[in-house]
């Protein structure tokens, strides 16, 4: 959905839903991310996301069981606002390149910590969102670059800057370059 129109409807963000699972797997077993992509428009809530991960072969069945449990949990969590939620797990060929363990940890932690959704409701207009932030897209692009796009909205300029700075701080903690546009 459009981040300005739908941010207050409790819609799921595919990047956040996927990253939550990957973060948990990484905490329990350790994994390496080869790719993680989702979303495509700055002003839209991410509807799709996918990742390729690498882990020890002996963990394959554990991860499959964990995935099935997570998928069932997410279907329950999102059954009202995302009744068509689909989560899929499949085996793929071993990728040629993966992120280091250190950078996998940083990326998954930053995406987990990145705020998304309604930050504040308006006191002047009850029922209206005052300030929100959207984790819009994650793209692995050339030259070992990961582009993470977010957007912030507010009817109070200082609050828009506040939430934009909060998002920037999350990514600066992992050494990312941050640009405001």
Regions found by a protein language model. Name each.
Residues 1-153:
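Midchain, well-structured core segments that form catalytic/ion-binding scaffolds
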Residues 158-177:
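Redox- and metal-dependent alpha/beta enzyme cores, enriched for Fe-S-associated oxidoreductases
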Residues 179-181:
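Short acidic alpha-helical/loop segments enriched in Asp/Glu that coordinate divalent cations
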């Amino acid at each position: 959905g459009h981040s300005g129109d739908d941010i207050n409807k409790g819609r799921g963000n595919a990047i956040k839903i996927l990253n939550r699972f990957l973060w948990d797997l990484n905490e329990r077993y350790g994994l390496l991310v080869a790719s993680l992509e989702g979303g495509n428009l700055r002003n839209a809530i991410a509807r799709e996301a996918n990742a390729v991960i690498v882990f020890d072969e002996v963990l394959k069945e554990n991860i499959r069981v964990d995935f099935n449990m997570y998928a069932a949990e997410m279907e329950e969590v999102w059954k009202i606002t995302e009744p068509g939620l689909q989560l899929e797990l499949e085996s793929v060929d071993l990728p040629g390149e993966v992120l280091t363990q250190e950078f996998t940890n940083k990326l998954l932690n930053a995406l987990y910590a990145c705020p998304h959704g309604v930050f504040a409701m308006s006191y002047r207009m009850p029922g209206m969102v005052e300030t929100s932030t959207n984790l819009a897209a994650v793209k692995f692009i050339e030259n070992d670059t990961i582009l993470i796009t977010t957007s912030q909205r507010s009817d109070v300029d200082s609050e828009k800057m506040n939430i934009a700075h909060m998002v920037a701080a999350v990514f600066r903690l992992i050494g990312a370059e941050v640009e405001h546009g």
